[in-house]
């Protein structure tokens, strides 16, 4: 699968897209939210300023297991390093323990219906990050 990574930045968000070279369709999307508060309480952890967090990682079903999500995450890591941002990646509880995640079942169905797999604030993002850092 041939694809390239495209970065679109706005004042508050950074979108990382994976684009199929042949069809020019977007096969993956990652969104980073920048937050410049002096102190941010996130997941009960108080951290310093210049925090960025990944809001979601979405990949097309056809792109699953092809390294697309990892490529987008690698690009995200580069961006965080370039901006000297602190990335807050917190391991999440298992899905069964995560009430918030259970409520997202409707959203999961919505994405699956349109051929997307949706990861957000879930353990798999953390796992993929570790993989992206190690490679």
Which positions does each model-derived feature cover?
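Conserved acetyl-CoA-binding loop-helix of GNAT-fold acetyltransferases
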Residues: 59, 65-78
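Conserved N-terminal entry element of GNAT/NAT acetyltransferase domains
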Residues: 1-9
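Short glycine-rich hinge loops at helix-strand junctions in the catalytic core
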Residues: 67, 84, 115
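Conserved GNAT acetyl-CoA-binding A-motif
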Residues: 80-100
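Conserved acyl-donor/pantetheine-binding loop and adjacent beta-alpha core of acyl/acetyltransferases
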Residues: 12-56, 98
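A short, internal acetyl-CoA/4′-phosphopantetheine-binding micro-motif in the GNAT/acyltransferase core
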Residues: 55-64, 93
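C-terminal "cap" of GNAT-fold acetyltransferases
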Residues: 47-48, 93-95, 101-108, 114-135
């Amino acid at each position: 699968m041939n694809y390239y990574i495209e970065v679109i930045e706005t004042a508050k968000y950074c979108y990382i897209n994976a684009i199929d070279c042949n069809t020019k369709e977007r096969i993956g999307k990652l969104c980073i939210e920048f937050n410049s508060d002096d102190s941010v309480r996130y997941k009960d952890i108080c951290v310093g300023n210049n925090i960025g967090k990944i809001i979601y990682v979405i990949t097309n079903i056809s792109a699953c297991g092809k390294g697309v999500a990892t490529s987008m995450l690698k690009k995200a890591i580069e961006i965080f390093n370039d901006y000297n941002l602190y990335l807050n990646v917190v391991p999440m509880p298992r899905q069964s323990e995560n009430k918030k995640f259970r409520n997202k079942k409707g959203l999961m169905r919505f994405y699956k219906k349109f051929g997307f797999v949706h990861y957000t604030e879930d353990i798999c993002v953390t796992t993929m990050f570790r993989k992206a850092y190690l490679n």
